[in-house]
């Protein structure tokens, strides 16, 4: 062709690192397309708060609900970004976001526009998104519920999960929806992960069918979202039956292995009703893999058998459940922090716990998780949890007074007994990162480490080898 005009192209380095993917250097962690490490500091912000609408009479309700919606997300995302969060999870199947109508192949353009606006908000606050496509568990065309689905194909209602999972018409209709989402977001680096379903085993006793569906669908979704992480999730790992589902699941077809675990005194596994730190350690030990990143994708505390949010949340002004849930996974070689549930007025928002992301962010900033070849160590004593992540150049640590637990501090309303702790180091000066103010009587820095006198709660630390 004809040269119209000759010039010089200047390329300027920017802050865009590409997509979030499994690290090519260490498959236990995430990195951007350009190799820059990405340590996942996430939270569930799955759906907006529903506010019941007045009927116009004093104290009377209409039975309908309204949402602040995107305005509420603006507030949440602003707080998250300010305190160090870098990724949030959204349930696209919730009625506020879901583009589904009651007919297959008919999508709601208004709902798709809301998702577009959500992506714009995430960009504005430099946050990544994990999009969970579905969370429904049954079909009941006479009932309204967050876990219910109304869907027809060619005018005929779908009446069972079995039919939805096995019928080619419904499978292809669902893939059409995924294709429409892919047209909008598969080329967008803000979208880091596509999760097919929230706790898919909860749809009922269709284990073989669920496995078959996932083995077939996960590769097809990955083909539509080749640059995003693609995975799925299962319910809380708290019983032998669920544990078998976790072990048998086709994680080899995913880009990340996800665990859900809560403090739940009604769980068949008794460890789930005790202290969160050993419970989280046990879950990661059970599912340990070197093939792909692991995440504690849902965590927190619930009343027996997930009947409601934890009754002692109201007493947790210092966020001790938050800290133990969110911080612990890092020290068992998770690819990210624990992603807390109950993000809204049930816990995180009402107690203003966003600030506790900051110490964690300060700890991980500047650490190249993909190059350290980290190993996790447990040096706990009878009085303190002492968890280390030791790498080639950097060691990260988490110390918690064992008496500062939910049973003593929240239920019994007793102050923890102060303890003395010595942290031995083999490198340069130790950097103490406080979590709570007025936590200790004194830090004494010695040639071989640091001695802490009168530790009430806990702290983070790191040092260079």
Task: Say what each PLM segment does.
Residues 1-12:
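Ligand-binding face of N-terminal immunoglobulin V-set domains in extracellular IgSF glycoproteins
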Residues 142-155, 312-317, 354-358:
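Short, electropositive alpha-helical surface patch
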Residues 293-294, 302-304, 318-444, 453-464:
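Aromatic- and carboxylate-lined catalytic core of secreted/periplasmic carbohydrate-active enzymes
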């Amino acid at each position: 062709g004809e040269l119209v005009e000759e010039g010089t192209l200047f390329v300027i380095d920017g802050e865009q690192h590409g997509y979030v993917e499994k690290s090519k250097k260490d498959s236990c962690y995430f990195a951007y397309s350009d190799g820059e490490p990405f340590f996942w500091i996430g939270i569930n912000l799955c759906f907006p708060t529903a506010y019941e609408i007045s009927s116009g009479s004093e104290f009377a309700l209409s039975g309908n609900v309204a949402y602040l919606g995107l305005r509420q997300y603006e507030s949440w995302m602003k707080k998250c970004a300010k305190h160090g969060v870098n990724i949030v999870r959204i349930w696209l199947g919730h009625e506020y976001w879901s583009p589904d109508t009651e007919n297959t192949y008919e999508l709601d353009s208004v709902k798709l526009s809301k998702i577009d606006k959500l992506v714009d908000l995430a960009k504005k606050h430099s946050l990544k998104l994990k999009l969970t496509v579905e969370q429904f568990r049954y079909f009941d065309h006479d009932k309204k519920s967050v876990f219910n689905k109304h869907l027809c194909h060619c005018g005929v209602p779908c009446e069972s999960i079995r039919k939805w999972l096995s019928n080619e018409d419904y499978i292809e209709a669902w893939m059409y929806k995924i294709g429409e989402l892919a047209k909008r977001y598969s080329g967008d680096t803000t979208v880091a992960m596509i999760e097919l379903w929230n706790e898919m085993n909860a749809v009922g006793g269709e284990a073989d069918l669920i496995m078959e569906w996932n083995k077939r669908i996960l590769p097809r979704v990955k083909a539509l979202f080749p640059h995003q992480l693609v995975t799925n999730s299962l319910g809380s790992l708290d019983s032998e039956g669920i544990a078998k589902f976790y072990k048998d699941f086709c994680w080899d077809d995913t880009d990340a292995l996800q665990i859900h675990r809560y403090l739940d005194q009604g769980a068949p596994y008794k460890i789930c009703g005790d202290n969160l730190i050993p419970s989280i350690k046990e879950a990661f030990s059970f599912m340990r893999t070197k093939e792909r990143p692991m995440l504690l994708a849902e965590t927190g505390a619930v009343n027996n058998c997930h009947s409601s949010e934890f009754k002692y949340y109201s007493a947790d002004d210092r966020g001790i459940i938050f800290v133990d849930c969110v911080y612990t996974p890092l020290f068992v070689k998770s690819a990210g922090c624990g992603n807390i549930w109950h993000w809204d007025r049930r816990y995180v928002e009402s107690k203003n716990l966003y600030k506790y992301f900051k110490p964690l962010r300060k700890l991980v900033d500047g650490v190249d998780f993909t190059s350290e070849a980290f190993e996790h160590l447990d040096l706990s004593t009878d009085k303190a949890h002492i968890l280390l992540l030791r790498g080639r150049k950097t060691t990260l640590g988490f110390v918690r007074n064992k008496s500062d637990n939910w049973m003593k501090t929240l239920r019994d309303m007793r102050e923890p007994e102060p303890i003395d702790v010595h942290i031995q180091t083999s490198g340069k000066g130790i950097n103490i990162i406080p979590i709570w103010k007025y936590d200790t009587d004194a830090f004494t820095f010695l040639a071989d480490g640091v001695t802490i006198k009168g530790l009430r709660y806990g702290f983070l630390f790191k040092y260079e080898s």
